[in-house]
């Protein structure tokens, strides 16, 4: 049985966000931590922390403005059955720059803006708006 851990992460965030939960907990991985760093840097989550010794857990503290959700939507783009790769010219712009695309490049995981600035293409992991 194969599970898409990034899709699972996005689904957990989406579900907790819809229910206005303060935080969401999930199994940790290096890729998930890097995505959490990007979400924090871009202002979509308040904070995150990794805890545990053997089985590490990633806890994201979600961000709200009153009762308004900061994250309007999350969408997994590249899936295990259908990978989506783009060149630097094809790097997508989410909602005319109002959202972000998370891209895995040979220099690491970064936003669409950082990938364009570094003149890199790669695998489009997800859209966040």
From Swiss-Prot:
The record's section on SUPFAM superfamilies has: Ribosomal protein S8
Task: Establish whether keyword Endoplasmic reticulum is in the entry.
Answer: no
Say which domain of life the source belongs to: Bacteria
Tell me the InterPro entries matching this sequence: Ribosomal_uS8, Ribosomal_uS8_CS, Ribosomal_uS8_sf
Q: Which GO terms describe its molecular function?
A: rRNA binding; structural constituent of ribosome
Bilayer-spanning residue ranges: none
- Note whether Plastid occurs among the keywords: no
Q: Name one GO biological process term.
A: translation
Q: Which UniProt keywords apply?
A: Ribonucleoprotein, Ribosomal protein, RNA-binding, rRNA-binding
GO terms under cellular component: ribonucleoprotein complex; ribosome
Checking PANTHER family in the record gives: 40S RIBOSOMAL PROTEIN S15A
Q: Which family does it belong to?
A: Belongs to the universal ribosomal protein uS8 family.
Its quaternary organisation is: Part of the 30S ribosomal subunit. Contacts proteins S5 and S12.
Q: What does this protein do?
A: One of the primary rRNA binding proteins, it binds directly to 16S rRNA central domain where it helps coordinate assembly of the platform of the 30S subunit.
Protein name in the entry: Small ribosomal subunit protein uS8
Q: Which organism is it from?
A: Spiroplasma kunkelii
């Amino acid at each position: 049985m194969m599970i898409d851990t990034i899709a699972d992460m996005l689904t957990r965030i989406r579900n907790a966000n819809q229910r206005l939960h303060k935080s969401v907990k999930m199994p940790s991985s290096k890729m998930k931590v890097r995505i959490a760093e990007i979400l924090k840097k871009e202002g979509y989550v308040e904070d995150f922390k990794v805890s545990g010794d053997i089985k590490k857990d990633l806890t994201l503290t979600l961000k709200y403005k009153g009762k308004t959700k900061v994250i309007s939507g999350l969408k997994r783009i590249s899936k295990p059955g259908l990978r989506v790769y783009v060149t630097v010219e094809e790097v997508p712009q989410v909602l005319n720059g109002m959202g972000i695309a998370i891209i895995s490049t040979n220099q690491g995981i970064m936003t669409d803006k950082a990938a364009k600035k570094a003149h890199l293409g790669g695998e489009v992991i997800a859209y966040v708006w």
